[in-house]
C-alpha cells in the first residue's frame, strides 16, 4: 500500500488482506486492453534442524554461492516473491510502456488459495491475465 501511495497509484486492500493496485496506461497505450499482473504475498519457509533462525521473526540472510543467491540453513523463501517484485518493478519503471495495469497481490495462497477465493474478481476490468 505504501509503495502504491508513494507512486501516486490507486490502491485498496480488502478485508482478507489482498491488495489491488491500479496504474494508468502509459502514453500511446491508452486504447490497448488492460493487463493483470498477479502474485501472492505469503511463503512457506523451511530450514535444517540445526538452523537457529526463527522463521516467524528472524530475517533470512542471503549469500551468493557460485553465482547463485542462496540462504544458509533455510530456503531462500523467494517463492512467488518474484511475481510481486516483477509487478512492482513494472509499476516503478519509467521506461516500460504498458496498457492500464491491475496488480493483484493475494494472501494465504500457501494454505489453500484463501486470499484468491475471497477476492471479488468482478471488480477487475483488464482484458488479459
Describe the predicted segments one by one.
Residues 2-5, 17-20, 84-87, 110-114:
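Short amphipathic alpha-helical surface micro-motifs
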Residues 29-100, 105, 110, 117-120, ...:
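Active-site metal-coordination/substrate-binding segment of hydrolases
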Amino acid at each position: 500500500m505504501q509503495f502504491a501511495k508513494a507512486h501516486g497509484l490507486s490502491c485498496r486492500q480488502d478485508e482478507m488482506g489482498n491488495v489491488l493496485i491500479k496504474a494508468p496506461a502509459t502514453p500511446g497505450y491508452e486504447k490497448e486492453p488492460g493487463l493483470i499482473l498477479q502474485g501472492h504475498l505469503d511463503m512457506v519457509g523451511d530450514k535444517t534442524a540445526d538452523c537457529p533462525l526463527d522463521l516467524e521473526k528472524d530475517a533470512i540472510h542471503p549469500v551468493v554461492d557460485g553465482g547463485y543467491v542462496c540462504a544458509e540453513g533455510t530456503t531462500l523463501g523467494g517463492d512467488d516473491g518474484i511475481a510481486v517484485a516483477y509487478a512492482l518493478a513494472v509499476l516503478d519503471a519509467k521506461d516500460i510502456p504498458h496498457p492500464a495495469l491491475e496488480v493483484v497481490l493475494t494472501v494465504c495462497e500457501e494454505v489453500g488459495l484463501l486470499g484468491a477465493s475471497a477476492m471479488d474478481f468482478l471488480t477487475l476490468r483488464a482484458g488479459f491475465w
